[in-house]
From Swiss-Prot:
InterPro entries assigned to the protein according to its UniProt record, in alphabetical order: HrpN/Z (IPR006961), T3SS_HrpZ (IPR054634)
Ranges of Polar residues composition bias in the record: 219-228
Subcellular locations according to the entry: Secreted; Host cell membrane
Region (Disordered): 202-247
Signal peptide interval: none
Region 2 X 7 AA repeats of G-G-G-L-G-[ST]-P, residue ranges: 213-275
Taxonomic lineage: Bacteria, Pseudomonadati, Pseudomonadota, Gammaproteobacteria, Pseudomonadales
Pfam name, any one: Harpin
Gene (name only): hrpZ
NCBIfam families in UniProt: T3SSHrpZ
Keywords: Host cell membrane, Host membrane, Hypersensitive response elicitation, Ion channel, Ion transport, Membrane, Repeat, Secreted, Transport, Virulence
Protein name as annotated: Harpin HrpZ
Region (Peptide-binding): 86-194
Family: Belongs to the harpin HrpZ family.
Length: 345
């Protein structure tokens, strides 16, 4: 009876009850992730662990290290790394991410890993720039990813005109600040690559709770003022990138540019077809009365100019998107690469 009385007294003490309950909580864990997602987390944790501790030499390792330090788990072992990864994935990709993955096949398991890495890469893009005054600043820790973005911009000068430093890679070397115009250009690149990461993530199986595609939500352009979507090759070809002019525009100037473009195409050997040839013959001095008026000639040149513009715009858009898709894959592969391996690559 004395023993029963002692146990009852012990259990009535809040502090002692906490001591009794806490070890059980730590042992069982509190993850609500699906079994499939927990297996992915375990694989990632192994990749990020060196000598029993987190290796922070990779971009994902650095991100996880900051998260663990913020939660008081810096220097923790494998189980702490798993718990931090679990929390990070749900914070970045949604509470219900991977909820239906337990019903997936082995292929689905691989797809889930792809979704996790693409989703984390996309979220990291959104955190690369931090607002400061009338521009943004960036961290030296993020330089491996930033450099890939800058190289993408330098490879597509029609979409991203060179800054004063001569190249976007050089711009990153000058200091860790981008002014307003530079920030807009950089966020435009982030948005295009983010769309590719989102598309690749969705194509991997659509198991995530938040499967919405699109950009990063960064303020690349003001939708109230911009007449078209960001990076639309046809709009850029006609009005210039990120045009905020009135939607009516200067129609006369646009028509003049298209006619000039058509004339250049004809002189380059493109040809305008029979109607315009007839007009050219009829306009020779001393010839018969013209069979076509000047309007038909200008109409042919206008049509040819429009065709050339559309063709170039399509090639530009395809080139940028293809380049962005390649960079997106590179960024995903970089997540688990140490800084040393990145330098070798």
């Amino acid at each position: 009876m004395q023993s029963l009385s002692l146990n009852s007294s012990t259990l009535q003490s809040p502090s002692m009850a906490l001591v009794l309950i806490r070890p059980e909580t730590e042992t069982t864990g509190s993850s609500t992730s699906s079994r499939a997602l927990q297996e992915v987390i375990a694989q990632l944790a192994q990749e990020l662990t060196h000598n029993g501790q987190l290796d922070e030499s990779s971009p994902l390792g650095k991100l996880l290290g900051k998260a663990m330090a913020a939660s008081g788990k810096a220097g923790g072992g494998l189980e702490d790394i798993k718990a931090a990864l679990d929390t990070l994935i749900h914070e970045k990709l949604g509470d219900n991410f991977g909820a239906s993955a337990d019903n997936a096949s082995d292929t689905g398991q691989h797809d889930l890993m792809t979704q996790v890495l693409n989703g984390l890469a996309k979220s990291m893009l959104n955190d690369l720039l931090t607002k400061q005054d009338d521009g943004t600043r960036f961290s030296e820790d993020d330089m491996p990813m930033l450099k890939k973005i800058a190289e993408f911009m330098d490879d597509n000068p029609a979409q991203f005109p060179k800054p004063d430093s001569g190249s976007w890679v050089n711009e990153l070397k000058e200091d860790n600040f981008l002014d307003g115009d530079e920030t807009a250009q950089f966020r435009s690149a982030l948005d295009i690559i983010g769309q590719q990461l989102g598309s690749q993530q969705n194509a991997a199986g659509g198991l995530a709770g938040d499967s919405s595609g699109g950009g990063l939500g960064s303020p690349v352009s003001n939708t109230e003022n911009s007449p078209g979507s960001l990076g639309d090759p046809l709009i850029d070809a006609n009005t210039g990138p990120a045009s905020n002019s009135n939607s009516n525009g200067d129609v006369g100037q646009l028509i003049g540019e298209l006619i000039d473009r058509g004339l250049q195409s004809v002189l380059a050997g493109g040809g305008l077809g029979t109607p315009v040839s007839t007009a050219n013959t009829a306009l020779v001095p001393g010839g018969e009365q013209p069979n076509q008026d000047l309007g038909q000639l200008l109409g042919g040149l206008l049509q040819k100019g429009l065709e050339a513009t559309l063709q170039d715009a399509g090639q530009t858009g395809t080139g940028v998107q293809s380049s962005a898709a390649q960079v997106a894959l590179l960024l995903v592969n970089m997540l688990l690469q140490s800084t040393k391996n990145q330098a070798a690559a």
